[in-house]
Structures are given as C-alpha cells and as structure tokens.
C-alpha cells in the first residue's frame, strides 16, 4: 500500500514550489512597475495600471525628479502625440517589447494607440474596436462613450485589457484583451459582459451600467468595476466583473443587492495583492436595510463577497447619505500603510459629504464608526483618485476636490491614527494627483493638472512640495498650456518624463537634464523643526448647517495646546492638531479676524481675515 502521508507531502511540496514560482513572477512584475527611475537604466520601467500600483497610491520613483530639476520642466514640442478621440483614462508606459518603449492610450472613440514615448508617433493603432455610443442612453455626461476606464497590462503574457462600450442594436460592454506589442486581439476575446455576467439571478445590462474606473489585474483575474450613468437613471447597480485571463469564458461577478451603489471613482478597483477593495455610492428603495451601498467593500478572488462585517464598512448614517445623494464612493479606494499606527493597514474613502474615512482593511467592521474621520473639504469629493505617500515627516494622503482645492492630510502613527491637516493650495480644475520621489522616501512632489476649462481648470501642470505644499512647478509658459484635458484624469512618470493624455493628444513634459546614470543617492529633503514664533495660519470660510464657520489650519506651533482668537477675543483652547473649525454662531454677513497662539503665551500666528458676504 502507498504511504498516503508521503504522497500528500510530495503533492504539497509541488504545490508550494509552484505557488512560490508564481509569486516570484508576480512580485517581480509589481516591483518593476513600481520602482521606475530608481532602477539601473538597463532595467525595465513599466506603468501597467491606474496610479502605478494596485494600492492606487499614485507614487512614481524616478531619480531625475529632484525639486530643482522639476522646477525646470518643459513640454517636449518635438513629441507629436496626435490621437483621435476624447480621453478620460490615464495613459500607460510599457517596455520590453520588440518595438521598444510605448505609451498606451485609449479614447472615447474606441481607439487604442501605442505611441513612441520620445517622438509621439504611432507604433500601432486599433480604430476598428467598434462604434462608440453617441445617443440612446437614458442619461449620462460622457459622449461619445467608448473606452473610459484606465486599462491594465499583464507583462507576463504581454496583454492589454480594457472595457469598451460599443453601439449597435443592443449597446454592450465588451472586455478586450490585445497583444500589447502588436494590437492584435488575443484568442477567445473579447468578453460580452451582457451575455456572461450574472449575480444572484440578476443579469448585467450595459444600457444601465457605465464603466469609469481603472481595471485591476490580481492573480490572473482582470477586474472591471461599473457604476451608472451620470444622473442616476435606470436600474443600475454597483458591479465588479472578474475575467480569468487564461479562461475568459469563466466570468465571475458581484453586484449590489439594491438599485444604485455605483463604483464611480477614477481608480476603480484597488488591491492589496490578494483582496480587492471598492467604494460604493448611494442606493435606492432599501426600506432602511443596508444592501451594499455607501460602503467600502473587500472582495475575495472571483470576485466573491462574503457579506460578513469583516468584509464591509458603512457609516452609521449611511441612510442619510443615501437620501442626500452624498455618495461615500465619491472617490475610489486608496490603501494606506501607516508604520507605527494601530491599526496600520488602512483603506481610505473620500465621500461627497466632504469627509475622509479611514478603516482597518484587515477587519472593515460592518456598520460602525470608522477608525478615523475628518471633514477635509469645502467642496464635494467625487470622481477622482487620491494619492498616499511617506516622507520623513510622516504618512500623507492628498486629493483634488470639486472646488479645485488640492488638499493634503497627515495620518498620525498613533492608536488609533488621526487625520491632521497638512496643507492646501488654491483652486484649479479637477485632475487626480500623482507623486514623484527620487528614491521612495525623499524629494516627494505632488503633481496635478488643473483639468477641464469647463470646471475652472487652467489646463496646466502644477507641482507642490509634498510636506508643505510650497510651489515647485507653477505651470510653465505659453508652450506648456494644454487643451482638452478632462476632469479627474491623471498623469504618469517614466524615464524622466511626465505624460498626460487629453482630447486628441498626449502631452510629454521633460526635465531640463537627462535622468542621471547611474542613479545617485538622493539627498534627503528635511523640513526643520519649527521654532516658537513661526506659526503659519491659513483660514477660509464655509457654511456648516447655515452657520458661518472659519476653517483654521496652522503649522509651526510646538505647544501641546493652542489658543484660538476671533476678533481679538479668546474663543477656544484646543489640542495642537494643526486644525480647528471656528463655529461663530452667526448666519449673516460678517467679517472675522482669527489668529492662533501657543496656549497661555503671546507666541502667535499671523492674522487671517475671512469675509462672509451673506
């Protein structure tokens, strides 16, 4: 008789070896995609997905992007970049193929391009995917509607994946796989989502579902998220469809039980390498029963949703958010690690209610209070992707709200962590930020484009010191002005260049000098410890439940507590957390002059004046 235990040991040894080999390949792909210019110049640089990493952190490592070099950025006028169609999706950058490096860009006309990253000329193109939808949708704000979400690339198989909405007697979403080096459609693709995606007896309907978010590729399955069309029309649901890249006929899906619950954010599906995270919006006709909306959800491979409290979080006021159309899922999920915090592995949601929420991503907790929350915006948070990064000063997240403000907040390494204001810069457009660093720790710069002239955008590139918000790159001159930039879009970084895709064109920006070879050790940028008397105060007004409220944000104070003065009168003493909302009790026209001082002293900030016209 065979030794069954020995046989089991042989089988498990083989499986473990196979899993280790697969993990090594996947880890290498992720490593190559995330380290950018920190690698020697003979190593590959690849930007394969939305915000460069599955966590959607938006960080790009490129040794050339020191603050002094970044200040001299100019547009490469010799780069053509001509394409056809409107662009809402982030471009990608792929190396390692027979044609050399490529910029991959997709458009709402259902066109796909591979461009030479230096000359901007076409390497290959696909203009035969199918006609985009230009009419016949019950509502919406994207027309034509074709390829909206950012694609994803599998380097191992050299495959490009994207979702295209194609017009016809029946309007349909198709998930495509192309050879990234030639543009040819891979065998057994595309996948007809209408025909293959079902969940609990519910069929997918492209007429009700829009695809906006970036695709994710996790352990051999490509995940695509769906919302409704702008206007909340039709019987749409929040959907995540999973397609195994080696067996595309075996389609998996999950959807919200209630109508609504769309996944709206530009980042789409985030992942920790095993599980997927999405944030949903408002639902309808729930009779007060939570049914998948206004929530952070953790999905297992497939996708599979367990329904257990460990795998979802919704605020206790979710029903009020539903009633007010204040989607929790205004911004896509961002995974944040905070060394020293308890818990340290978090997921961020930024809601249309102007709040930020942090939740333990290893145990989301069900319907309960978050680990941390804060009012972080004087305008709606929606549509964009946030970023997260680490400097010598701590862990941050930053985002661009509907009012045009770029806001940065620090997450404290405490038990539990707290959200503390870091800096903000004045309004321009709605683009999603991204971050450069010379080595993963130093010289952090937050970049953003003031997208979409229809929403007050200046259509220029801007760069800010990631610790302080100080301007590093102010948009350039006449040559650096872009046109046709779309709200919520984001740029990428590769080989000492920034690429940003807009309507009918991909713009390339270059550093004034080549990326150093070999990569030098980056010089740390250290912010000095503030000394008394150097308190810097910012303030702006907002209405909170009709009450005149002055939002105060400061830096440089060293005392444990802060005295807050309004019009020369002490109105509050508060912990030194860098922020305080001064609720005046007034509702009409008024002017307020505020300052903050280290408690019990005359070491004070500048005075800020805030006017309320009515």
Predicted regions and their residues:
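Beta-strand-rich modules
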Residues: 584-601
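Bacterial N-terminal signal peptides
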Residues: 26-37
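Pro/Thr/Ser/Gly-rich low-complexity, intrinsically disordered linker/stalk tracts
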Residues: 528-558, 602-614
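Mobile, glycine-rich extracellular loop/lid and propeptide segments
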Residues: 44-300, 310-339, 345-362, 385-389, ...
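Ser/Thr-rich, Proline-interspersed low-complexity disordered segments
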Residues: 513-531
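Recognizes extended acidic, P/S/T-rich segments that occur
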Residues: 563-589
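Sec/Tat signal peptide C-region and signal peptidase I cleavage site
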Residues: 39-43
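N-terminal secretory signal peptides that target proteins for export/translocation
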Residues: 1-23
């Amino acid at each position: 008789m065979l030794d069954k235990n020995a046989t089991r040991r042989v089988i498990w040894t083989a499986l473990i070896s196979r899993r280790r080999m697969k993990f090594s390949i996947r880890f290498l792909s992720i490593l190559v995609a995330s380290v950018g210019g920190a690698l020697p110049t003979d190593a590959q640089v690849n930007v394969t997905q939305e915000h460069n990493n599955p966590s959607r952190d938006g960080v790009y490592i490129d040794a050339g992007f020191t603050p002094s070099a970044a200040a001299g950025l100019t547009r490469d006028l010799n780069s053509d970049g001509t394409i056809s169609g409107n662009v809402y999706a982030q471009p990608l950058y792929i190396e390692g193929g027979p044609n050399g490096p490529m910029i991959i860009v997709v458009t709402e006309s259902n066109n796909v391009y591979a461009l030479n990253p230096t000359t901007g000329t076409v390497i290959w193109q696909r203009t035969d995917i199918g006609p985009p939808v230009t009419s016949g949708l019950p509502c919406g704000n994207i027309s034509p509607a074709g390829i909206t979400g950012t694609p994803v690339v599998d380097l191992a198989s050299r495959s490009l994946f994207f979702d295209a909405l194609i017009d016809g007697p029946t309007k349909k979403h198709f998930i495509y796989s192309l050879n990234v080096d030639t543009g040819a459609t891979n065998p057994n693709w595309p996948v007809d989502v209408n025909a293959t995606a079902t969940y609990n007896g519910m069929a997918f309907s492209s007429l009700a579902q829009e695809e906006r978010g970036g695709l994710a590729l996790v352990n051999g399955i490509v995940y695509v998220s769906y919302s409704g069309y702008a206007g909340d029309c039709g019987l749409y649901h929040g959907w995540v469809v999973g397609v195994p890249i080696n067996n595309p006929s075996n389609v998996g899906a999950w959807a919200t039980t209630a109508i609504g619950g769309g996944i709206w954010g530009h980042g789409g599906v985030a992942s920790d390498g095993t599980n997927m995270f999405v944030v949903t919006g408002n639902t309808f006709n729930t009779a007060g029963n939570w049914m998948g909306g206004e929530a952070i959800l953790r999905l297992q491979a497939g996708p599979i949703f367990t329904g257990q409290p460990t795998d979802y979080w919704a605020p206790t006021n979710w029903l009020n958010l539903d009633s007010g159309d204040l989607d929790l899922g205004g911004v896509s999920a961002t995974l944040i690690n905070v060394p020293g915090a308890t818990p340290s592995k978090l997921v961020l949601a930024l809601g249309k209610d102007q709040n930020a929420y942090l939740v333990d991503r290893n145990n989301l907790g069900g319907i309960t209070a978050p680990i941390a929350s804060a009012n972080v915006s004087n305008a709606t948070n929606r549509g964009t992707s946030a970023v997260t990064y680490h400097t010598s000063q701590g862990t941050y997240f930053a985002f661009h709200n509907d009012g045009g403000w770029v806001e940065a907040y620090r997450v404290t390494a405490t038990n539990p962590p707290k959200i503390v204001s870091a800096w903000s810069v004045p309004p321009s457009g709605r683009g999603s930020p991204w971050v450069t660093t010379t080595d993963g720790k130093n010289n952090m710069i937050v970049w953003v484009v003031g997208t979409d002239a229809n929403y007050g955008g200046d259509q220029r590139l801007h760069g800010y010191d990631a610790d302080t918000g100080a301007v590093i790159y102010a948009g350039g001159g006449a040559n650096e002005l872009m046109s046709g930039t779309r709200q919520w879009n984001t740029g990428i970084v590769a080989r000492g260049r920034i690429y940003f895709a807009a309507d009918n064109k991909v713009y390339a920006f270059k550093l004034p000098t080549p990326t150093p070879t070999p990569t030098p050790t980056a010089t740390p940028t250290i912010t000095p410890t503030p000394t008394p008397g150097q308190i810097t105060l910012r303030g702006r007004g907002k209405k909170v439940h009709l009450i005149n409220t002055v939002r105060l944000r400061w830096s440089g104070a060293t005392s444990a507590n802060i005295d807050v003065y309004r019009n020369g009168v002490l109105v509050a003493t508060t912990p030194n957390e860098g922020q305080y909302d001064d609720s005046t009790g007034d509702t009409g026209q008024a002017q307020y002059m505020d300052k903050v001082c280290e408690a019990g002293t005359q070491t004070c900030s500048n005075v800020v004046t805030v006017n309320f016209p009515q």
